[in-house]
Amino acid sequence: LQARLPVLLGRADVKVQAAPCVGRCEQAPAVQAGQFPVAQASTDRVAEVAAGVLGGAKDQKAQAAIETMELPAYLASGGYRLLASVANGQRDGDDAGEQLIRTLEHAGLRGLGGAGFPAGRKWRIVRGQPAPRLMAVNIDEGEPGTFKDRWYLERDPHRFLEGMLVAATVVGCAAIYIYLRDEYHAQRRILQRALADLRQAVADGRIAVPAAGATVACSPLILPRIELRRGAGAYICGEESAMI
């Protein structure tokens, strides 16, 4: 494929370059034509997509359609209820944040970054630090085979957002920075739409904080500042890793 493409395309303004993992190992051979991924790539399909890119195409069906769970379906399945209860500060008469941290500690859940640091202990340490506290979400996936986050975000973005916001609420983060791999162009659009839908649902009162008494109206949910940032070519370009 790599040898045939330059001959097939035959254009000076098109460069064919071998690249390390682009987060699509389950779709090999995978090609990235501009911002458009081509799964199970053939020379003819890559040439077709490349021609579209050169022609200024804004969208291309370079892979099978993805079934993304949108906000109405997520809300209907109980989505954002945990976030609302945590934002209330109490769960079953107990401090919601402390209860969740104890649950994580008891479960023995560990991070997947290599060190295997216990998640509950990390949340407790961060929660005990002086404010302001910030959260950096690293979605770069620079190692071969690590396409799990992309697959998950494509299909269930609101579950990711709720988990992120639950963690931010428990530890008291004032702002969240989502660092997303630059090659994940379609996933960036999915997250942008999901964030816009979430903010609108909060503004409309569809997601609110339950009150302690049945006769008291729900109060608005206050979201932290959330910024979606494009990656810069490697996971070590993220602010979290840069500070380390």
Give residue spans per PLM region.
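Feature of Fe-S/electron-transfer and energy-metabolism proteins
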Residues: 1-244
